[in-house]
């Protein structure tokens, strides 16, 4: 089963409605839950199966500017981890795809603009990501990262979470056009 659903709005905490939160939660997480509940009994009966979930680097490390998306993708990470350790001994394999940025309709025109520079690397083509996924599931690797910078970021976050959060705060200020003192940049 390949669970690959995701929508986003670019909203934060105070500028997103509860309806928008629910819509993203339903698509980004609950679609995975419903699909797994539909196929898992048959997989368990056969004693084998493979579940591939698409989250996002926003679900592994969080992201700027799209809080409902990041939170719902964090939940997908939790779901995939739980499924992996709960059902491994019963023949169920699980992988989690956490791409940074893939050229899909979800990115729209942003894939060619400033967002691409902020993403930390080039936008991946879908065929390139598909090959990475095939290579990873062949070896039954759980976490599939599509960009080498993502591994570096994860290592930095886990090595020193406080430093990571401080760096993310500074990046947020730059994205908002303010300096480290909170003053508008000229």
Where are these regions (language model features)?
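Substrate-binding pocket helix/loop in short-chain dehydrogenase/reductase
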Residues: 12-13, 20-25
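Residue(s) in the substrate-gating loop at a strand-loop-helix junction
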Residues: 56
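Conserved NAD(P)H cofactor-binding loop of Rossmann-fold oxidoreductase domains
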Residues: 4-9
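SDR active-site lid
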Residues: 85-152
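Active-site loop immediately N-terminal to the catalytic Tyr-X3-Lys motif
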Residues: 14, 63-67
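A short helix-coil junction within the Rossmann-fold of NAD(P)-dependent oxidoreductases
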Residues: 11, 38-47
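Active-site helix of classical SDR
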Residues: 36, 72
């Amino acid at each position: 089963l390949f669970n690959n659903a995701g929508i986003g709005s670019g909203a934060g905490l105070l500028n997103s409605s509860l309806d928008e939160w629910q819509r993203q939660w339903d698509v980004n997480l609950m679609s995975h839950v419903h699909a797994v509940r539909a196929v898992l009994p048959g997989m368990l009966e056969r004693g084998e199966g493979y579940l591939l979930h698409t989250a996002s680097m926003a679900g592994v490390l969080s992201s700027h500017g799209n809080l409902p998306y990041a939170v719902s993708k964090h939940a997908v990470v939790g779901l995939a981890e739980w499924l992996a350790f709960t059902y491994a001994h019963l023949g169920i394999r699980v992988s989690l795809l956490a791409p940074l940025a893939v050229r899909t309709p979800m990115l729209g025109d942003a894939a060619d603009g400033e967002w691409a520079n902020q993403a930390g690397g080039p936008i991946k083509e879908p065929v390139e990501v598909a090959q990475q996924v095939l290579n990873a599931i062949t070896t039954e690797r759980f976490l599939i990262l599509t960009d080498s910078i993502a591994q570096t970021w994860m290592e930095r976050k886990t090595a020193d979470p406080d430093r990571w959060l401080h760096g993310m705060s500074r990046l947020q200020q730059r994205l908002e056009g303010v300096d480290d003192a909170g003053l508008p940049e000229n």
